[in-house]
C-alpha cells in the first residue's frame, strides 16, 4: 500500500475546454490541445492544486499522499504505452524491498480510482468517461488517513460500448476489446492520411505507405517505436508530450454520443 493507514482516496477532475476539441475537429488548431488541454493541466494546474489541498489536510494533522498523472512510466509488467508522450519506460528492473510488498514505483490505476470516487470509469477508448463531461477530463487524487464521509462507487455504467469511438479512430486502434495503445500512439502522432501536416515526402519510399496512412498496418511496440522517428510534424512540448494529430476523434465521438448528438 502507498499509505498503509489510509482511510480514503479523494478524486478531483479538471474539465478540458470543449473548444480545444472543436478546434481540432475543424482542422484549425492542434497544438493548443496538447499544451493547454494536457500538459498544463497535468503538469502545472494539478500539481499546484494538489500541493494546496495536501497542505490543508496536513495542517489538520493528517497525511496527504498526492497522486498526479505519471505519463511516461509504466509499472513492471505493464507492456502498454501512453500515446500522449514521446515514449514510455517500463520499470523492468524494479524489485520489492521484501516479500509481500508491492514493486516500486507504485502507480495507482486512475480508472479504478475514479470509479471508486464516483467520478467515472474506463471506456472502450482507453479514457476515463465522466457522466457530465465524457472523456473531456483530467484527474488527480489524494490518498489520506483523514476520516471522511465518502461517496459511493459508480453503480451504472457510463460507457455503453456503443462503438462510436471505434468508427472514429483514423488508425483502427480501438475494437470491442478496447484500446491498442501502441497502434493508437502511431496515429495520435499523425501517421494517418487526414493529418493536415503530411506531405508527399512522408514515407515516400516505404512500400507500406498506403497501408499505414489508411490505418491498415498493425503496429506493436517495436514497429511503433521505429516509425516514431518519422512522425515529427510539430515539435514535442516540454515534459515530452507529443502533439495530438488525430484530433482525439474517439473522445469527440464519445462525448457526442453521451450527449445524444449522434
Regions flagged by a language model, labelled:
Residues 1-51:
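Non-catalytic, usually N-terminal nucleic-acid engagement modules in DNA/RNA processing proteins
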Residues 35, 39-262:
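Catalytic cores of enzyme domains
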Amino acid at each position: 500500500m502507498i499509505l498503509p493507514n489510509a482511510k480514503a482516496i479523494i478524486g478531483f477532475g479538471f474539465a478540458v475546454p470543449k473548444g480545444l476539441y472543436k478546434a481540432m475537429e475543424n482542422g484549425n488548431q492542434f497544438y493548443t490541445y496538447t499544451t493547454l488541454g494536457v500538459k498544463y493541466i497535468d503538469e502545472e494546474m494539478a500539481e499546484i492544486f494538489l500541493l494546496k489541498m495536501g497542505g490543508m489536510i496536513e495542517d489538520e494533522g493528517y497525511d496527504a499522499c498526492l497522486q498526479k498523472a505519471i505519463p511516461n512510466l509504466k509499472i513492471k509488467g505493464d507492456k502498454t504505452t501512453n500515446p500522449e508522450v514521446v515514449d514510455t519506460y517500463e520499470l523492468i528492473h524494479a524489485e520489492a524491498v521484501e516479500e509481500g510488498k508491492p514493486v516500486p514505483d507504485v502507480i495507482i490505476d486512475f480508472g479504478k480510482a475514479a470509479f471508486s470516487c464516483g467520478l467515472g470509469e474506463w471506456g472502450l477508448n482507453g479514457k476515463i468517461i465522466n457522466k457530465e463531461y465524457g472523456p473531456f477530463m483530467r484527474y488527480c487524487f489524494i490518498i489520506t488517513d483523514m476520516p471522511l464521509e465518502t461517496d459511493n462507487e459508480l453503480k451504472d455504467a457510463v460507457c455503453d460500448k456503443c462503438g462510436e469511438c471505434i468508427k472514429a479512430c483514423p488508425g483502427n486502434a480501438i475494437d470491442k476489446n478496447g484500446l491498442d495503445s501502441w497502434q493508437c500512439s502511431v496515429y495520435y502522432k499523425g501517421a494517418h492520411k487526414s493529418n493536415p501536416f503530411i506531405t508527399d515526402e512522408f514515407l515516400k519510399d516505404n512500400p507500406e505507405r498506403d497501408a499505414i496512412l489508411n490505418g491498415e498496418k498493425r503496429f506493436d511496440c517495436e514497429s511503433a517505436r521505429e516509425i516514431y522517428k518519422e512522425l515529427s510534424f510539430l515539435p514535442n512540448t516540454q515534459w515530452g508530450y507529443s502533439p495530438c494529430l488525430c484530433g482525439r476523434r474517439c473522445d469527440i465521438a464519445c462525448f457526442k454520443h453521451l450527449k445524444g448528438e449522434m
